[in-house]
Amino acid sequence: MKLEKSVTDAFKNKQAKLFREYLAPEFSAIDVEGVKDADAEIADMEKTDLSNYSFADMKVALLSPKMAVATYKVTTQSTSSGRDTSGTYYAATLWNKRGAKWLAVLHTLVKAQ
């Protein structure tokens, strides 16, 4: 949960360099707009205002000593390009430990109905 909070705080505060440090070179994000690489995710960060967020139902499964998946629900107050994107979303992040550092390889985000 600490990693998810740290990477989300970097996104919220538009800290592109710090945000990128949490992403593997082959990082992909999947959301309603499609599949994005790290550069596209950072471009989205620049046009997003995330004023508040909270996590719920966080579960982390250790798939191997170097792979873990975090699944959770996140509720946001946010806009993207001036459009209200607030709501509740289901999310998952696949993390890979490289050396002493965990990096996000894949992140998915789907708005709850």
Label every model-predicted segment:
Residues 1-14, 22:
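Short, aromatic-enriched amphipathic alpha-helices that serve as compact interaction elements
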Residues 13-30, 39:
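Short, well-ordered alpha-helical segments enriched in acidic and aromatic residues
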Residues 23, 74-76, 108-111:
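Short beta-strand segments enriched in hydrophobic/aromatic residues
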Residues 23-25, 56, 91:
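Residues that flank catalytic or metal-binding motifs in active/ligand-binding sites
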Residues 44-85:
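Surface-exposed, charged secondary-structure patches
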Residues 88-113:
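Short beta-strand edge/turn micro-motifs at domain boundaries
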